[in-house]
Amino acid sequence: MVNVVIFAPSPDQLGYIGDLLRRLQTDEVRFESIHHFGSPEILNHLNHYDVIIARGITYRMLCGLYPGKHITHLGFDGTDILSALLECRESFHPKKIGLCLHHDGLKAVLPGLSELCRAELKLYEVLDEQSAYDAVEACRRDGMEAIVSGGTVSNICREQGFPCTYIHIRPATLERAIEEALNTARVINTERTKTNIIRMNLDNSDDAVLA
């Protein structure tokens, strides 16, 4: 049995993910889905899982905690970000939006995104929980009127009453990540079966020699 856990990006996606995982469950692969905000203690107790699916800060923390484990990144793409920016514009009508996330490769497309959502955009790097708090504070200081971000920053904004739009991951992106994890789990299961067969053959050989 190979154990797989997915950290749901948001609580409202737990139901959808649960339905999807029930369809994929097999005798060889066992799925679980959970959601936690911030840096919960549970991250230190995942040794019994063979494959983990996570995004953002949680993903980076898990890579540091479990360097030898199979960890699938659940990342949003440009379409997800643009959808959130347009939703932010419709909801809050801001002239300045702080885009708070780990922004590899985003600088090049920032002018285009700014034009599409008709607002000034500024990037704020978020790598961990402390930098998430720092990013929200920097947005206040810089006069940003709203924020577009992932889960940790969104929760901070909700606590502080700062206008914020959460970047939702499309179902297709979720399904691709889960399929990738399922394929990895199948490979792990196959390798374990091979190892068990070899071990059995060696044990039988030893018994034959002793006889």
PLM regions with names:
Residues 26-47, 77-86, 119-140:
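A short, well-structured beta->alpha microelement
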Residues 42-76:
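Helix-enriched interaction subdomains in cytosolic or periplasmic regions
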Residues 2-22:
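N-terminal basic/disordered segments at the start of proteins
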Residues 29-31, 69-77, 118-125, 163-173:
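Short hydrophobic/aromatic-enriched beta-strand-loop microsegments
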Residues 51, 101, 142-148, 153-193:
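Short, low-complexity N-terminal regulatory "tails/caps" that precede and couple sensory modules
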Residues 191-211:
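Sensory modules in modular signal-transduction proteins
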Residues 16, 80-88, 109, 131-136, ...:
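Short, charged, surface-exposed secondary-structure boundary motifs
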Residues 6-12, 33-37, 54-57, 75-78, ...:
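Structural motif
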